[in-house]
Amino acid sequence: MLTAIIPIDLKRRPKDIIRKAINIAEATKNNNIKVIFGHGNRFTTYDRTFTRLLNGYENVHVKSCDNFSKAINASLLRNQAFKSVESEYVILLDVDIYPDFNLFEKYKEKIKSGIKPFYILPCLYLTKYGTSILNDRKASIESLKKKYFAFSRKEFLHLASPSSITILKSADYETLHGFDESFRGHGYEDFDFLVRLYNHYFIPKVKADFLADRPCHSPLFVTGFRRYLGEYCLDILLHKDFAFHLYHNKNRNEDYYIARTENYHIFKQKHKKNISNERYYDSTLLMLFIKHCIDKGEDIRNYSIYFD
């Protein structure tokens, strides 16, 4: 069995989060997947509603912990959820991820077969319209993918690779002592965990530009630590496999997002000691992806959207 651990804090957009959590719970009825919500209980009406509704599902468990802090700490909530994991494999999800459990099972089986020790799935961010047609079943996963590769604009925001959606062995989560709870608010706790996971299995190749922090619309133009992790995801991009992120409103002036600045500082302090003076011959993933296409006999024109 595969267990999904999902952090839940209802301080922000509680109605949207509860609705999406219920949709994930409903999806477990037809799949051999368990979901554990790491719930930061602020003892509001929304928290009581969430606990009551979600505990009614057979394959869903709400692992609540008291939360009297102003800050949202996804790392702590993931670690709380993991304490209840009993399966050999775990997937790191957020409540905004569409529950494509067939995709998640596919990559769990690849780990089980020894192909790779873990997988980081790319994530395609949907617009409000794209989210609506997927949720209302006016578009399937496959039809949305076809629209994306045909350069349709109105359904999509961008493709993130790497993303935080990771399938791994539960033993590895434990070995790494989970997520670093010094990260609070939004950002970088996932990159920190993924870098540590990657370095657990592979010899670190941290180049001079590792700390470059430049998010990118294209998965092939990423640099710095995103390139470092993104190289590991190239095979999945070739297979055109990715998860979908469902739309929600953002207010960049919220404390939750402002915390990114401090979180990046924590990330930088943790990883700067491993940086070498060596540089990549290509600071992006363009050349490597082209080489992958040639090696696999794939027509690069089938992936034109990745270069946009």
Question: Where is each model-derived feature located?
Answer:
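Glycine-rich, basic loop-to-helix element that forms the pyrophosphate-binding segment
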Residues: 68-84
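Short aromatic/hydrophobic "clamp" motif used to bind/position activated sugar donors
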Residues: 90
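The conserved acidic donor/metal-binding loop of glycosyltransferases
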Residues: 94-98
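C-terminal catalytic/acceptor-binding lobe
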Residues: 16, 185-308
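N-proximal low-complexity "stem/linker" segments adjacent to membrane-targeting elements
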Residues: 1-26
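Conserved catalytic core of nucleotide-sugar-dependent glycosyltransferases
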Residues: 82, 100-182
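Acidic donor-binding segment of Leloir-type glycosyltransferases
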Residues: 21-66
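Cell-envelope/extracellular polymer assembly enzymes that use nucleotide-activated donors
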Residues: 1-5, 34, 192
